[in-house]
Design a protein with these regions (language model features):
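Sec-dependent signal peptide recognition
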Residues: 1-9
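Short sequence/structural segments immediately N-terminal
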Residues: 16-257
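Alpha-helical transmembrane anchor segments
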Residues: 259-261
Length: 261
């Protein structure tokens, strides 16, 4: 039930994203134009998810900066280290929970990263192993235990991601022609949802959680594959039954013809 809820939430979030506003209408960018340029290329802006005020407070469309930053507008300016995770958690609650419970979670340690260390602040991109790997090496030496653990996590997730895509592709090809297989489509969605939970677990580098969610994803894929196996077995059985029936008809027709002669 939890996994189904996650899938429904992800669908709702994707459906709720709107077209972004014109950055020329955002007064903040008139002065902070470099930040505005970076933000306009981010996934946050391009998917219409947030604007300047969601992290900095204030009134983003107010040209008078005194009014835009006035008391009561929630203006905080540049968030402090202690505020960053909480701000991101307004949307990324699960990620924040994993992060704060992981090895990097103590923001008071200046050597520890914050959300923007890996994801940037304005130029936020979809997270990828390549993007994050470049950040890890800022603190961790190549070949260190920490990087080796990260490499194992990346390998596990990549392998499972390929599995999900392979099963999804095969099922998408067959399902339009085989109504019975359409019932297997949600299984792949659940597998994808479990994989997303595993990816979220990377914020805390929780290898046990990641392994458990990957296994959960794999179990759903096996169910989907079993549905396809059962479908083809049933199809072969039906073909044999049809062939036997036709043979029976042919034999009876032949016997009738012989008797008439």
């Amino acid at each position: 039930m939890i996994l189904r809820g996650v899938c429904m939430l992800l669908f709702a979030l994707s459906a709720s994203a709107t077209q972004p506003v014109d950055m020329d209408e955002v007064a903040c960018a008139l002065c902070h134009f470099e930040e505005g340029d970076d933000f306009s290329q981010s996934v946050h802006y391009q998917r219409g998810l947030i604007l300047c005020n969601d992290c900095h407070g204030g009134l983003p469309f107010e040209a008078d900066d005194v009014v835009a930053k006035a008391e009561g507008t929630g203006f905080i300016g540049r968030p402090s280290r202690e505020q960053i995770a909480g701000l991101c958690a307004r949307c990324h609650t699960a990620s924040e929970i994993h992060f704060t419970s992981g090895p990097h979670g103590n923001w008071r340690l200046m050597d520890n990263p914050t959300c923007i260390t890996c994801h940037h602040n304005h130029y936020v991109l979809d997270a990828s192993p390549v993007l994050l790997q470049s950040k890890c090496t800022l603190c961790h030496d190549a070949g260190s235990d920490e990087l080796q653990r990260w490499d194992r996590i990346v390998e596990t997730l990549d392998r499972q991601r390929q599995r999900v895509v392979a099963v999804q592709t095969r099922l998408d090809t067959l399902a339009p022609e085989a109504r019975a297989l359409r019932r297997a489509l949600p299984l792949v969605e659940f597998a994808h949802g479990a994989l997303r939970e595993a990816e979220t677990g990377t914020h805390g580098l929780d290898t046990a959680l990641i392994a458990a969610k990957v296994e959960e994803s794999e179990q759903e894929l096996r169910k989907a594959e079993q549905s396809m196996t059962d479908y083809f077995a049933d199809l072969r059985q039906r073909k044999w039954i049809a062939a036997i029936l036709w043979l029976f008809v042919v034999i009876n027709v032949a016997l009738l013809w012989v008797r008439r002669k």
